[in-house]
Amino acid sequence: MVTDKSKKAKTEEENVEQIDAELVLSIEKLQEIQDDLEKINEKASDEVLEVEQKYNVIRKPVYDKRNEIIKTIPDFWLTAFLSHPALGELLTEEDQKIFKYLSSLDVEDAKDVKSGYSITFSFNPNPFFEDGKLTKTFTFLEEGTTKITATPIKWKEGKGLANGVNHEKNGNKRALPEESFFTWFSDAQHKEDVEDEMQDEVADIIKEDLWPNPLTYFNNDADEEDFDGDDDGDEEEKEGDSDEDDDEEDEVGEE
């Protein structure tokens, strides 16, 4: 009886060892396949970057041409910003006055694409600051952090960093923010390297949403004005129809 139990225990132990060995072998094979996939993914990423680098060069003169046309349209960037659902909330009344001098906006990837990008605001001569260009640069570091640098603004005498006041909402007008948009540049002077997940949300919106097609947001504002105008026309037409109906009722009553 004891011998049978001993044999059974030994058999179970051998089965467990066999299962463990098979499991280890399967995991090793799975890891090899996963390593192969990683190599393919790395190669794909490198090739995607090469394509992106190639087309960045091709896009550059087209973006330059777009900027030249935009310069001929009054308040283009101010209108596009104000019409954007996120960016429009960031401009104080004083910011809007400054944005009237904004002549061009440029987003430029680093040459290798993966190491970062910069956003540059170019201004016509204005009464607010000396700078012709304000640039904010994002450099992606190997340790997973991002180095952020920005042009220190040289405000003209008596101007300084424009901090708005909290304006009450008037009718359908949006409530204006308390802090100037231009703190976006000055904040970078006080920041150390930040983690990737703490990336600059404003920069992401400008780079990924506004910059690719600002005309979408510029036209949004124009479309809304046209829509409001159509509404006014419809209301006038309805009032005219109502007056005609009243006249007809009066004539029937006189008969």
Curated annotation (Swiss-Prot):
Residues 213-255 are annotated as: Disordered. Disruption phenotype: No visible phenotype. SUPFAM superfamilies: NAP-like. The acidic domain is probably involved in the interaction with histones. Can form homomeric and heteromeric protein complexes with NRP1. Binds histones H2A and H2B and associates with chromatin in vivo. It is found in: Cytoplasm; Nucleus. The keyword Cytoplasm applies. This is NAP1-related protein 2. Residues 19-60 form a coiled coil. Double mutant nrp1-nrp2 shows arrest of cell cycle progression at G2/M and disordered cellular organization occurred in root tips resulting in a short-root phenotype. Double mutant nrp1-nrp2 also displays hypersensitive response to DNA damage and impaired somatic homologous recombination. Ubiquitous. One of its GO terms (molecular function) is chromatin binding. Belongs to the nucleosome assembly protein (NAP) family. InterPro entries: NAP-like_sf, NAP_family. Residues 221-255 have a biased composition (Acidic residues). Keywords: Chaperone, Coiled coil, Cytoplasm, Nucleus. The keyword Nucleus applies. GO terms for cellular component: cytoplasm; cytosol; nucleus. GO terms for biological process: double-strand break repair via homologous recombination; nucleosome assembly; somatic cell DNA recombination. Acts as a histone H2A/H2B chaperone in nucleosome assembly, playing a critical role for the correct expression of genes involved in root proliferation and patterning. Required with NRP1 for the maintenance of cell proliferation and differentiation in postembryonic root growth. Involved in both intramolecular and intermolecular somatic homologous recombination. It comes from the Eukaryota.
